[in-house]
């Protein structure tokens, strides 16, 4: 079944209808030679087993064979999860450890996703764009090419409450640390959002905004461009 991920109600329907998953990893020492491992990925040597699968299936095996098990350790990182994480092997970008990127996200060539960044379903990250440490791109947020989203900054999602207009950050925009771009706001090409700003209305091209709520304080000039230039070496 296909879903229109530009529509917040379709995303909500996708989450509702998705099979919820609680995958676990189990490390077991014991005799499980007579067990049925259907739907479970199993690796073993002798009495040592590593199992990957849904919690309800693996826990049944553990419970039914507890007298044969010497040691057991279980690892899990989610419960009743509706959306898997993105398969990063298919992305030609630099993605650092600790970034959380949900499936159905588009990431452009040579983008950089730093530690602790969170990118939600339906978001788009343009070519050469950096999402810095602990920054958040909410559902359906759109970042153009060569954008810098500063550490701790937030591009609000438009899933709940639902909105038809996502946040749009156009090409060559720099958003300072801990800035917040509210739902549906558009930031024009080449503009700069000062650190800590709260942007509540659309921003035209090639201006600098600052404050809470953010207001235009000047046009982008040579000095501003020099202070906010990106480093290509970070994107190689």
Swiss-Prot record:
Superkingdom of this protein's organism: Bacteria
UniProt-listed InterPro entries: DapH, DapH_N, Hexapep, Hexapep_transf_CS, Trans_hexapeptide_repeat, Trimer_LpxA-like_sf
Gene Ontology process terms (BP): diaminopimelate biosynthetic process; lysine biosynthetic process via diaminopimelate
Catalytic reactions of this protein: (S)-2,3,4,5-tetrahydrodipicolinate + acetyl-CoA + H2O = L-2-acetamido-6-oxoheptanedioate + CoA
Enzyme class: transferase
Keywords: Acyltransferase, Amino-acid biosynthesis, Diaminopimelate biosynthesis, Lysine biosynthesis, Repeat, Transferase
Pathway assigned in UniProt: Amino-acid biosynthesis; L-lysine biosynthesis via DAP pathway; LL-2,6-diaminopimelate from (S)-tetrahydrodipicolinate (acetylase route): step 1/3
UniProt-recorded Gene Ontology molecular function terms: tetrahydrodipicolinate N-acetyltransferase activity
Enzyme Commission number(s): 2.3.1.89
Function, as annotated: Catalyzes the transfer of an acetyl group from acetyl-CoA to tetrahydrodipicolinate.
NCBIfam families assigned to the protein according to its UniProt record, in alphabetical order: DapD_Ac
Similarity comment: family membership: Belongs to the transferase hexapeptide repeat family. DapH subfamily.
Entry protein name: 2,3,4,5-tetrahydropyridine-2,6-dicarboxylate N-acetyltransferase
Gene behind the chain: dapH
């Amino acid at each position: 079944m296909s879903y229109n991920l530009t529509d917040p109600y379709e995303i909500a329907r996708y989450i509702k209808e998705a099979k919820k998953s609680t995958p676990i990893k189990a490390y077991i020492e014991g005799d499980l030679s007579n067990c049925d491992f259907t739907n479970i990925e199993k690796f073993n040597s002798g009495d040592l087993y590593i199992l990957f699968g849904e919690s309800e299936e693996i826990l049944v095996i553990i419970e039914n064979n507890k007298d044969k098990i010497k040691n057991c350790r279980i690892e899990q990182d989610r419960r009743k999860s509706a959306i898997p994480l993105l398969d990063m092997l298919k992305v030609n970008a630099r993605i650092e450890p600790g970034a959380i990127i949900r499936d159905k996200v588009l990431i452009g060539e040579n983008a950089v996703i730093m530690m602790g960044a969170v990118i939600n379903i339906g978001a788009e990250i343009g070519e050469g764009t950096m999402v810095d440490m602990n920054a958040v791109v909410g559902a359906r947020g759109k970042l153009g090419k060569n954008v810098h989203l500063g550490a701790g900054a937030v591009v609000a999602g438009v899933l709940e409450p639902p909105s038809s207009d996502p946040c749009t950050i156009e090409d060559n925009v720099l958003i300072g640390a801990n800035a917040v771009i509210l739902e549906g706001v558009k930031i024009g090409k080449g503009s700069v959002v000062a650190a800590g700003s709260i942007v509540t209305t659309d921003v035209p091209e090639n201006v600098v905004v600052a404050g809470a709520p953010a207001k235009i304080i000047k046009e982008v000039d040579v000095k501003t461009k020099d202070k906010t230039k990106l480093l290509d070496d970070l994107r190689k």
